[in-house]
Amino acid sequence: PQAAGLRSRHTRTLGFILPDLENPSYARIAKLLEQGARARGYQLLIASSDDEADSERQLLQLFRARRCDALFVASCLPASDNSYRELQAKGLPVIAIDRVMEPDQFCSVVSDDRQACQQLTSSLLQPLPKQIVLIGARPELNISQERADGFREALQGFTGEVIVEHGESFSRDCGRQLMEQLLQRLGHLPDALVTTSYVLLQGVFDALHDFPLKSRPL
């Protein structure tokens, strides 16, 4: 089969570079991609970049060396990076998953993050809180900017206190650290809180679990 693949230039393998294998959202995407690929006679190779640019560049070259027929990626590379443009110019199709890439260059399969965060935030405004917090990560990423924009759009005309915190990574530990720091600074729970990912929310719950009971409102 491998020799036949070399002759036909098709290996019936696909690559998927995701930011974090422990992130439940990406784990589910990987599972669905693998199931879909297998049903169509393809093998899906999965690797985690740990949301680090150098690791991601190494992985995309690895998948190119494996002669994958296409590459799916949730990229952390800046828009100015030419790695994927160069890869696609050499004949490897690149499809962006969850994190949008240049629409004139790449196909992207993404959610409407701005609208989703706007709707989520709006749902917390009745009854009107005095204070609302956004906990996110990686503010330089398009996906983070879209979610933060949706948060701010929902708060147009809001006169209460708005706090925005961004960490260095989409991780449970980062969510916990951000929430712990917030609680130490405020000395109380915020009236309303939005997180930009499930994994950050897990960390927030960890921090709330350890928050002293005497500090919690009855």
Roles of regions detected by a PLM:
Residues 18-28, 46-55, 77, 99, ...:
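Hinge/beta->alpha junction and helix N-cap segments in small-molecule ligand-binding domains
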Residues 95, 156, 198, 208-218:
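Venus flytrap/periplasmic-binding-protein-like
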Residues 83-86, 145, 205-210:
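Short Gly/Thr/Asp-enriched flexible loops that form oxyanion-binding sites at enzyme active sites
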Residues 130-131, 160-162, 214-218:
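Short acidic capping loops at alpha-helix termini that bridge into adjacent secondary structure
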Residues 13, 129-132, 192:
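Residues that mark the start of a beta-strand
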Residues 9-122, 126, 182-188:
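Alpha-helical recognition/docking segments in bacterial nutrient-uptake
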